[in-house]
UniProtKB/Swiss-Prot annotation:
Name the record gives this protein: Thymidylate synthase 2
InterPro entries linked to this entry: Thymidate_synth/dCMP_Mease (IPR045097), Thymidate_synth/dCMP_Mease_dom (IPR023451), Thymidate_synth/dCMP_Mease_sf (IPR036926), Thymidylate_synthase (IPR000398), Thymidylate_synthase_AS (IPR020940)
Pfam families, per database record: Thymidylat_synt
GO biological process per UniProt: dTMP biosynthetic process; dTTP biosynthetic process; methylation
Function as written in the Swiss-Prot or TrEMBL entry: Catalyzes the reductive methylation of 2'-deoxyuridine-5'-monophosphate (dUMP) to 2'-deoxythymidine-5'-monophosphate (dTMP) while utilizing 5,10-methylenetetrahydrofolate (mTHF) as the methyl donor and reductant in the reaction, yielding dihydrofolate (DHF) as a by-product. This enzymatic reaction provides an intracellular de novo source of dTMP, an essential precursor for DNA biosynthesis.
Single GO molecular function: thymidylate synthase activity
Assembly and binders: Homodimer.
Enzyme Commission identifier(s): 2.1.1.45
Amino acid sequence: MKQYKDLCRHVLEHGEKKGDRTGTGTISTFGYQMRFHLQEGFPMLTTKKLHFKSIAHELLWFLKGDTNVRYLQENGVRIWNEWADENGELGPVYGSQWRSWRGADGETIDQISRLIEDIKTNPNSRRLIVSAWNVGEIDKMALPPCHCLFQFYVSDGKLSCQLYQRSADVFLGVPFNIASYALLTMMIAHVTGLEPGEFIHTFGDVHIYQNHIEQVNLQLTRDVRPLPKLRFAREIDSIFNFAFEDFIIEDYDPHPHIKGAVSV
């Protein structure tokens, strides 16, 4: 995708060397935005092969409200293993905040259910927001949320989503995040009777780890190929009824996978 290659070039050309929590070191910039028109194809990177199974199962895991890696491991997904404790627990991470946010008065709020109801009944609302940044529980999380807040917007029968990501690993994380939130937007559009609009990806600290520079430069030498298409295998009326088998990716023809170490 041209938008992704432009992001890589921007960070390499304008970023500054910074230390970071992991000790790896980064080239970092602050503030950047990409836009993807979902009618033009499913924005899954073609300059390297992505593991769609991991993207889809992680999103389904979030939507279940699950915070234990057991479900992921049972489905061949290992992307959260490094942060889990000996029992597979991660603390109140994304799934917990999306589905059972704990308010100050002890009330539990299902943000996803509330969001979908609001899209159906009050599509012009400016409060179509889900937040994973629960300040009162951050210290209990294995990893504070990187993609921490997203908002929906309905216009002309189309549903658009804007994500704010406070911290973005350009090589490993960002390609997953793009595809994940594009998929979520398409799923919510489907169950609310809307068409997919745009996915808008807004970054805070967007960085390339020092040990990923070679891989990023390799991607920049590769041509951008046509985007794949994503469709659903059946009609589904609830966001919580989707299964992995419902996602059909067509015409995905990426360049080969590129390995890169995760900084923990």
